Amino acid sequence: DGCDVGVSVTKAETIWAKYPEGQRRPHRFRDGMWSNCNLFALKSRETLGAAKAFEGGGQFGKSKKRVLQAFGWFNLLLYVSKMMTLKGTFERISKRFGVRIAPIEMPFAEAPIDVDNERTARIAREILAARAAEAA
């Protein structure tokens, strides 16, 4: 849609329908719950500044200071209060970073499953085993 940065997201319902334990903390918006897939598309070098704010991967969200620096108090308040839609949130973030950032919906339940603990490692092993069985 003419964006400069694409951020892949999957609906929480999509994940939970296939993997009930697959994602425990989706982002909650006024129009639904979404999980980040940690897959980004950057149109040009000029968009790298927006991506720099998220260096460090999944640990970004665990640092309140980094989240506040990246998004600002008001955007954080809107997010926490669930007053914004997914699209509206990305529009506000776009203004904050000075580039057009848009969500890209991924239809794959597996896309946002990070392997960063025993529970998600088990889910990943189950996914791989099921795919191997299908291929055999």
Predicted regions and their residues:
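Short amphipathic alpha-helices within nucleic acid-binding modules
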Residues: A121-E126
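Short, conserved phosphate/pyrophosphate- and ester-handling motifs at nucleotide-, phospho-/glycolipid
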Residues: N117
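Short, charged/polar low-complexity linear motifs in solvent-exposed/disordered segments
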Residues: V67-L68, T120, R131
